């Protein structure tokens, strides 16, 4: 229909800002330059398509820096793009909204006991649905980049890495199971991620 959104192009560029944030609490000048350069290119693409409205969001990599507001201002001054910083719950809401846009298929799946695992750079959000209702949602600080930086900080050799990740994940997941999963049997798992797929 007339008011339906249609994808014309899909352009992606990965910049792992979180690896700086989770290690030092700051984003390096080099990564900031990369980000601003990329956003300028996106601004040019939007201009060529005559885009009249856009949304640019920042998540935990920017939210958890020591100077979030300064970064926001610097990005806007250098690129003309205003980045809105999302809270964890706002970010997850948008992710779930995109899944729910799949319509009847999504509703049918979450009628049964379903876990949505939202895997990000800073954390994993586990949300449980049953009978078409959100039962619980919990954030575990087991994101891909956060774990990577922790392993780098611990100077873990490749043989130790798997064991350390297993220990960290098992400890948090065991606590999660005791507190939230209890005796629920999960029928479906939906994975939302930026890191597992290419």
Regions found by a protein language model. Give the residues of each.
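Acidic, divalent-metal-coordinating active-site segment for phosphoryl/phosphodiester hydrolysis
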Residues: 122-125
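Nucleotide/phosphate-binding catalytic cleft detector across ATP-hydrolyzing
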Residues: 2-116, 127-198
């Amino acid at each position: 229909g007339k008011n339906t959104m249609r994808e014309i192009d899909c352009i992606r560029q990965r910049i792992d800002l979180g690896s700086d944030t989770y290690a030092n609490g700051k984003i390096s000048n080099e990564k900031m330059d990369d980000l601003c350069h990329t956003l300028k290119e996106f601004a040019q693409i939007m201009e060529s398509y005559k885009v009249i409205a856009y949304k640019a969001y920042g998540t935990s990599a920017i939210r958890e820096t020591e100077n979030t507001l300064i970064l926001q201002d610097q990005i806007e001054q250098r690129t003309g793009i205003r980045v809105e910083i999302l809270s964890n719950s706002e970010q997850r809401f948008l992710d779930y909204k995109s899944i729910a846009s799949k319509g009847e298929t999504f509703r049918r799946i979450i009628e049964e006991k379903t876990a949505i695992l939202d895997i990000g750079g800073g954390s994993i959000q586990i949300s449980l649905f049953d009978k078409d209702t959100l039962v619980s949602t919990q954030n575990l600080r087991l994101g891909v980049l956060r774990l990577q930086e922790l392993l780098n900080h611990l100077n873990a050799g490749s043989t130790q890495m798997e064991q350390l990740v297993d220990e960290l994940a098992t400890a948090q997941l065991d606590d999660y199971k005791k507190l939230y999963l209890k005796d629920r049997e999960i029928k479906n798992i939906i994975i939302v991620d930026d890191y597992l797929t290419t």
